[in-house]
Design a protein with these regions (language model features):
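CN hydrolase (nitrilase-like) catalytic-core segments centered on the catalytic cysteine
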Residues: 29-169, 178, 334, 346-365, ...
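Active-site regions of metal-assisted phosphoester/phosphodiester hydrolases
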Residues: 215-218, 224-247, 406-432, 443-446, ...
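Short, compositionally biased "basic patch" segments
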Residues: 262-318, 418, 427-445, 555-570
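C-terminal functional modules of predominantly eukaryotic multidomain proteins
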Residues: 3-30, 566-619
Length: 619
């Protein structure tokens, strides 16, 4: 194939290395002093950025926009060629030594030499294809090779940031300590404040990027967990740092507890799943009137009325009793998860207060919600995390954060029929869209143990690849929890398919969870074989586990036991990294005993008429 005319006009029609460096670091690589109170002097790019994350972000951006990863030869064997980027085994060892000196002693002289060499190619064309074409006078792939040396060095200098190094290196990791200090929440000089109406404290935001000089409206950089074991991308090249999109695309944060992290151990991670609501009425789905009056259209908007929490004390009471039953099955209850839209902030706060009184060992509680702690309505996920003793009071404390759903649920005519909602949502309307504000998408990665990080998705966030799938693949959390308002969680349905994609790349363990109330509506429609699958587990081994609602229609839960396993991830340049993978190790039904499952509780699972009928039949 012949090159296009635009490519032949190479002398004036390409962006240079420096064009993109200046784009991603518009204020230079080093803070410029002010002279006599005047404006700072002109920015400079000759000095190596102080943080490996800045070097990584700048160089990874160069490699991404230039498409250079496809020209990199992963193997250190062989001789290389003029049309490939090759690093010998000796060169790779030298880079490891440079990174170790930078990481442990802050010594960066050798890295500065590489940075200076990169800038010597500042006028070079970004595109490897043009560089390799003969007779163009465009030079060679020299800048690309230097860029790969820099990105590997910066990535190795950040070891210990997302997972522990262990041994002596962990104790002398000055770069890890410096970067962790840069990731502290922006408190504005204030401690976390208790949220009105609960004992939970509002958690301040962590920075969107662990960088100083990078323009976060261009790229962001955060730590990394699992490494993709398939494909040839920048994601599979880095072991410790992740290149992310601009903060306005998705505002991400890497959140860590204030106090030291708990060690990963061989004990199970025991999670109580509570698939509330246990009953959903058809009239809980309500049409939202159109703002354009009576104009004809083939779509509509709907909202959900949470009739199941009209008496919030009922769900609180059930939750505490399920916790007590679960604690009869495990020495340590580690987490509680509710599905999408199960609670609101008020109920969530009260459940958290009561749950931590009964089970102080809990590490986190997650739930879908119709609002957040500021009473902003929408489709939210609420996350409460326990922090060990720290601060002035030297007591454990609980923080809370929230984010909005990234998409809107669309119900088509088939789904309206499947969920038996035709009386509430006209089946003649082609599609019904969930009504809620999205605003700036956010994604929070919660590091809850030394080698373990989780992220939570809300229904369509899992089903739609934009905007967060690429980010999750880059950061590689060990655990992904997907809160759904959906039917049965079957291996052949959409939840399992999209969970498989994240289990394959980058190796996340994924658990979906839906409400028993919506499954009951599907079962009662008679269109499909009845199912009690409220949750589904998928991990990198290909293992698929269906998690079943216990027998009966009353409120119940399931205790899921996960266990960590040492695993080795490998980058495409051959570096081996010790990592942590969570595997499924069983489920146990959690039922209220006969004395606790009185008619008031059964109202949530049977409905008023069925419950009254049951009561009369026992007289």
């Amino acid at each position: 194939m012949q090159d296009s005319d635009s490519e032949l006009e190479y002398a004036t029609q390409y962006r240079s290395v420096f064009d993109e460096l200046r784009n991603v670091m518009p204020h230079g690589t080093f803070p410029q002093p002010q002279v006599g109170g005047d404006a700072p002097t002109s920015p400079t790019w000759e000095v190596l950025p102080a943080l490996p994350t800045d070097v990584f972000g700048a160089v990874a951006h160069l490699l991404r926009v230039s498409g250079t990863i496809g020209w990199f030869e992963p193997s250190s064997a062989g001789l290389g060629s003029d049309d490939s980027i090759f690093l010998s085994a000796e060169e790779r060892i030298d880079l490891e030594e440079l990174a170790k000196a930078w990481r442990t002693d802050g010594e960066s002289e050798g890295v500065q030499d590489l940075w200076t060499e990169l800038l010597s190619h500042k006028d070079a064309c970004l595109r490897p294809r043009l560089l390799c074409q003969e007779g163009r006078g465009q030079g060679s792939l020299d800048w690309c090779k230097v860029a790969f040396k820099l990105i590997l060095t910066a990535d190795m200098a950040a070891e210990g940031l997302g997972r522990p190094l262990g041994g002596d290196e962990e104790r002398v990791n000055v770069m890890r300590d410096l970067l962790s200090a840069k990731n502290q929440p922006d408190r504005g000089g204030q401690d976390e404040k208790t949220i009105a109406g609960s004992s939970l404290r509002r958690r301040h935001r962590h920075p969107a990027s662990m960088t100083e000089r990078i323009d976060t409206d261009v790229v962001c950089v955060l730590p990394k967990g699992r490494i993709a074991q398939v494909g040839c991308t920048l994601r599979s090249l880095s072991a410790n740092l992740a290149l992310l999109p601009p903060r306005a695309t998705v505002r991400c944060q890497w959140a860590e507890p204030v106090a030291p992290l708990r060690h990963d151990d061989r004990a199970t991670l025991d999670i109580l799943l509570i698939p509330a609501p246990f009953e959903i009425q058809g009239i809980d789905f309500e049409e939202v009137p159109s703002s354009n009056g009576g104009a004809a259209r083939d779509w509509g908007n709907f909202s959900l009325k949470q009739s199941w929490i009209e008496d919030p004390s009922l769900l609180e009471d059930i939750t505490i009793k399920l916790i007590r039953q679960a604690k009869k099955q495990t020495k340590s209850l580690n987490a509680i998860i509710f599905p999408e839209y199960a609670l609101d902030w008020g109920v969530f706060g009260k459940i958290c207060d009561a749950a931590w009184r009964d089970a102080p060992e809990l590490e986190f509680i997650i739930s879908g919600s119709s609002n957040n702690c500021d009473q902003h309505e929408g489709n939210h996920v609420l996350t409460a995390l326990r922090h060990e003793k720290s601060g002035r009071d030297n007591r454990p404390w609980i923080s809370a954060v929230s984010r909005r759903k990234h998409h809107r649920w669309r119900l088509d005519a088939r789904q309206v029929s499947d969920y038996a909602l035709a009386s509430a949502l006209k089946p003649t309307v082609a599609c019904w869209w969930e009504s809620h504000k999205i605003m700036t998408p956010e994604l929070y990665f919660h590091r809850f143990r030394q080698s373990s990080t989780f992220v939570t998705m809300i229904c369509e966030d899992l089903a739609r690849s934009d905007p967060c799938h690429e980010i999750i693949r880059s950061v590689g959390p060990n655990l992904v929890f997907a809160l759904l308002m959906d039917g049965p969680q079957l291996p052949g349905r959409w939840g399992a398919r999209y969970a498989s994609s994240l289990a394959d790349d980058p190796g996340c363990s994924v658990m979906t969870l839906t409400s028993w109330g919506l499954i009951r509506r599907v079962n009662q429609s008679g269109k499909y074989p009845p199912s009690r699958a409220i949750a589904l587990w998928k991990d990198e081994t290909g293992s698929v586990e269906q998690i079943m609602m216990p027998p009966g229609d009353g409120p119940a839960g399931v205790l899921v036991s996960l266990a960590g396993k040492d695993t080795t991830d490998r980058t495409i340049d051959g570096r081996c990294v010790s990592n942590w993978s969570w595997r499924f190790h069983g489920q146990q039904p959690i039922l209220l005993n006969q004395a606790e499952n009185h008619p008031r509780h059964r109202l949530m699972g049977l409905g008023l008429r069925a419950c009254l009928s049951s009561m009369l039949s026992t007289r």
